Amino acid sequence: MATLYDYYKSKVITQLMHELNYSSVMQVPKIDKITLNMGVGGAASDKKILDNAILDLTAISGQKPLITKARKSVAGFKIRQGYPIGCKVTLRGQKKWHFFERLIIIAVPRIRDFRGLSSHSFDGQGNYSLGIREQIIFPEIDYDKIDRVRGLDITITTTAKSNHEARLLLSAFNFPFRK
């Protein structure tokens, strides 16, 4: 079975070298890492909520998440400095490619009322961020075993120098941008 990484090596690199007029393979942008972040609002009051979020993120990513803690106290949200408020995972190497393949082929088309992803979510330096409202779009999550529906943020960090280069890179993988 050919993976997305093999497709990148065989087709995407030559296509982008031609489109961007690069002379070296090393100039072609690539996906550096994928970061998944799940903020959990009620984690300060109930530890079980954070534990369930960690289990969900572990199932989705295939690796153990890092617990994120509050940087400073905010009285309005009833959190203090050092309280656990979420979890995150940084995917690199083969896990990055496996997750990216599952995201494009399986998960994103399962989003309710899906009409494509916004092309305005680039940050100016070639990185793309998207928010997912329901973790149940991933096939690893069993709908009957979750305690509540949670969202997560996905950031795709590339080595592209501009938004245009990053958009060409993601479009080469048939990333479903809105037309």
Swiss-Prot record:
It comes from the Bacteria. Pfam families: Ribosomal_L5, Ribosomal_L5_C. The keyword Chloroplast does not apply. Transmembrane segments: none annotated. Keywords: Ribonucleoprotein, Ribosomal protein, RNA-binding, rRNA-binding, tRNA-binding. InterPro entries: Ribosomal_uL5, Ribosomal_uL5_bac-type, Ribosomal_uL5_C, Ribosomal_uL5_CS, Ribosomal_uL5_dom_sf, Ribosomal_uL5_N. One of its GO terms (cellular component) is ribonucleoprotein complex. GO terms for molecular function: rRNA binding; structural constituent of ribosome; tRNA binding. The keyword Calcium does not apply. One of its GO terms (biological process) is translation. Belongs to the universal ribosomal protein uL5 family. HAMAP family: Ribosomal_uL5_B. This is one of the proteins that bind and probably mediate the attachment of the 5S RNA into the large ribosomal subunit, where it forms part of the central protuberance. In the 70S ribosome it contacts protein S13 of the 30S subunit (bridge B1b), connecting the 2 subunits; this bridge is implicated in subunit movement. Contacts the P site tRNA; the 5S rRNA and some of its associated proteins might help stabilize positioning of ribosome-bound tRNAs. Part of the 50S ribosomal subunit; part of the 5S rRNA/L5/L18/L25 subcomplex. Contacts the 5S rRNA and the P site tRNA. Forms a bridge to the 30S subunit in the 70S ribosome. This is Large ribosomal subunit protein uL5. The lineage of its organism: Bacteria, Pseudomonadati, Pseudomonadota, Gammaproteobacteria, Enterobacterales.
